[in-house]
Amino acid sequence: MSTTTQNIPWYRHLNRAQWRAFSAAWLGYLLDGFDFVLIALVLTEVQGEFGLTTVQAASLISAAFISRWFGGLMLGAMGDRYGRRLAMVTSIVLFSAGTLACGFAPGYITMFIARLVIGMGMAGEYGSSATYVIESWPKHLRNKASGFLISGFSVGAVVAAQVYSLVVPVWGWRALFFIGILPIIFALWLRKNIPEAEDWKEKHAGKAPVRTMVDILYRGEHRIANIVMTLAAATALWFCFAGNLQNAAIVAVLGLLCAAIFISFMVQSTGKRWPTGVMLMVVVLFAFLYSWPIQALLPTYLKTDLAYNPHTVANVLFFSGFGAAVGCCVGGFLGDWLGTRKAYVCSLLASQLLIIPVFAIGGANVWVLGLLLFFQQMLGQGIAGILPKLIGGYFDTDQRAAGLGFTYNVGALGGALAPIIGALIAQRLDLGTALASLSFSLTFVVILLIGLDMPSRVQRWLRPEALRTHDAIDGKPFSGAVPFGSAKNDLVKTKS
């Protein structure tokens, strides 16, 4: 940027069309967050009505994560082939329909299936909205684009918590799911009036349709084998998370089977750059493992361990959700200032100072607990707002929506594991101790994976001929693309 450009406030670098595009995507993400967290808010009520065990109840949260990998793949490929807008609209219809079905669910299995539908829609929303906004904004503002967008999910969670305190005590838990579908008409109308992402239009102008991840996996020479593997992965995940299997050894074998299938899909779709894709899935897996025990089971902790009433639970969740939303925006500024990876590491390190106090002070002082949660979630959860920017930078425009959608949502299976692991540990420890220990220990793993830029580093070790040296979104060099002690300035920029 020139000196003159740098002196202009960042928000003046955006035109009206870019703001309208962001507003539409942000609203969709708010609705996504609203619909997705409803089950966490009413988990104890659903558990009581359906007569579920704690692990079965937690699996209803996990169900949405089980289907996310397939939703990210299919809807991401739709976004790569037909544009980001169509994928966004399809996604929002899916997760809204799933939310309505939850309200009518007569029992556990029906609600589990409805949550699978929500997961597919959520996955498509994440990949398509993130790529849409990031590709619509100027390169030097793309951490802000990512962070601001993801804040919508946390705002949706805050709104859901407030609606929960007003609706559930009067009309019951089913009414909450019926409300979740009402704003969808406005969102769909708004999305019909937004332009396509600039990067996608430039890449596809006058060119033949790209070969998407769906084309490679399900229309190529290995399509039969890939269809069989898809069904095998879906079946294995169903048995792992539907609360039917109690044998840990069988669950471990099925988990390894799924991992092998997902790695196979990544190798087929990314070719020589498969080490990068696999390591990105690992990064996201641990990102969910450290954050989602708190996200999923905090309402249960407040209601059971601290014996808070619905109104107090809503107030505490407001601080938590609002902190995460603010953190997404702060993370966007930090990312554009320090760089994506450095901002991520600094924010997570700061969050570690707060995680133990959050669960150590008990419930005597609601306001102190709320403030601690606000800052812990701002630093620990909010920084995940720039995760789409981090992941998307490893993929070209032609593969970005499916690459981001599949990679992120396979890794998001950590979010399916997290509440179940938390619930299992809580059978031997109190729930607060279980949540604090999981989050504190696994956050350090994420700090190492991102701080050392392990996707680029492992790519350099295993397939150096396909190493990407610079971020495909903002053009900045990857630290892991050079050995320790070498200068990043020596990197030669690769073609996108």
Swiss-Prot record:
Q: Does the keyword Transmembrane apply?
A: yes
Q: How does it sit in the membrane?
A: Multi-pass membrane protein
* Ranges annotated as spanning the membrane: 22-42, 58-78, 92-112, 116-136, 148-168, 170-190, 224-244, 247-267, 278-298, 313-333, 353-375, 406-426, 431-451
Query: Which reaction(s) does the protein catalyse, per the Swiss-Prot or TrEMBL entry?
Result: N-acetylneuraminate(in) + H(+)(in) = N-acetylneuraminate(out) + H(+)(out)
Pfam families for this protein: MFS_1
Recorded GO molecular functions are: carboxylic acid transmembrane transporter activity; sialic acid:proton symporter activity
Q: What family is it from?
A: Belongs to the major facilitator superfamily. Sialate:H(+) symporter (SHS) (TC 2.A.1.12) family.
* PANTHER family in UniProt: CARBOXYLIC ACID TRANSPORTER PROTEIN HOMOLOG (PTHR23508), SIALIC ACID TRANSPORTER NANT (PTHR23508:SF3)
Which named protein is this?
Sialic acid transporter NanT
Q: Which organism is it from?
A: Shigella boydii serotype 18 (strain CDC 3083-94 / BS512)
The root-end lineage is:
Bacteria, Pseudomonadati, Pseudomonadota, Gammaproteobacteria, Enterobacterales
Its gene name is nanT
